[in-house]
């Protein structure tokens, strides 16, 4: 797992409130196009966390997973996990799978999530992503999961969709999906505006039905070979351009598109300034008084594109008021200073992705964004 993304996943685990159980069966969409497979995502947290179902083994065993573009490991609990956090999880039974193989080339590892920890051993087995079958895929079997934060989490395991720092690594599952003329090394994510609606993750392509009519797809070159990042040149509010990235060496910031983070995270001083400009009257009783703002990105042709968020997008009641921001509003902002080669990082999580459909192209190393339905 990328070290950098240990903390961002903690944002989604600790910054949202559990409000209901998953009452409907997770399922695969019947409307997937030939060559692609769409997995329906169901919500279990206020507007923030969406969980999908995959199967592992022969015969298949089903698991609920959180799809995370900020990490690179796929792991699920083992039948040998006796920790309290594993009690309410579906556990993988390797004894009943005909294709299970222990991975002798790797030792067990610890993966840390803030104060939490998962201990995994590596194995290979067949992974089923709806109609797509990935044979002999490497994944992690968790023999231990810490009580905090995993006891209260409704997913069984984590499905990493990040970019590996090791360019020779062949363990990433989307790299191993069988290719054909209609199935590409692409996956795309749609998050609904409300937890009551279904989201979707599509492997092998993208689905235009999740894109708002007349909305174009803008394409952005991935600016880091380690993470799903794009070039961010600034923030606009009321026509005022905040050059939050002007002090960086290259003149831009790296903005991570991260499904494993619930909020929008960024440099502390930048977010303090932004909240002051959004809400000068210090009142949140009427959200219409709050201003809109836009992230500005540089596309693959060097053209600046603006992606606007309104108060309906960035004010979320499930978020606590952040003491650092010193503002009474429930901003879905997380002040945090994380360094990168191009200065401090911004992390655009599910608050952003509920407004914009995201397409991740591995072969071309680019990300597509379009306004979602």
From Swiss-Prot:
Phenotype reported upon loss of the gene: In the mosquito vector, midgut infection and oocyst development are normal; however, sporozoites fail to egress from oocysts and their gliding motility is impaired resulting in a failure to invade the salivary glands. Processing of circumsporozoite protein CSP on the oocyst inner surface is normal. In the mouse host, sporozoite invasion of the liver is impaired but the growth and development of asexual blood stages are normal.
UniProt KW keywords: Aspartyl protease, Hydrolase, Protease, Signal, Zymogen
Catalytic residues of the enzyme: 68, 258
Cross-referenced PROSITE patterns: ASP_PROTEASE, PEPTIDASE_A1
GO annotation terms (biological process): proteolysis
Cystines in this chain: none
Keyword Disulfide bond among record annotations: no
InterPro entries attached to this UniProt entry: Aspartic_peptidase_A1 (IPR001461), Aspartic_peptidase_AS (IPR001969), Pepsin-like_dom (IPR034164), PEPTIDASE_A1 (IPR033121), Peptidase_aspartic_dom_sf (IPR021109)
GO-annotated molecular function: aspartic-type endopeptidase activity
Catalytic activity, EC: 3.4.23.-
Transmembrane segments: none
Signal peptide: 1-21
The Peptidase A1 domain, residue ranges: 50-370
Role: During the development in the mosquito vector, plays an essential role in sporozoite egress from the oocyst and sporozoite gliding motility, which is required for the invasion of salivary glands and subsequent transmission to the host.
Similarity annotation: Belongs to the peptidase A1 family.
Name recorded for this polypeptide: Plasmepsin VIII
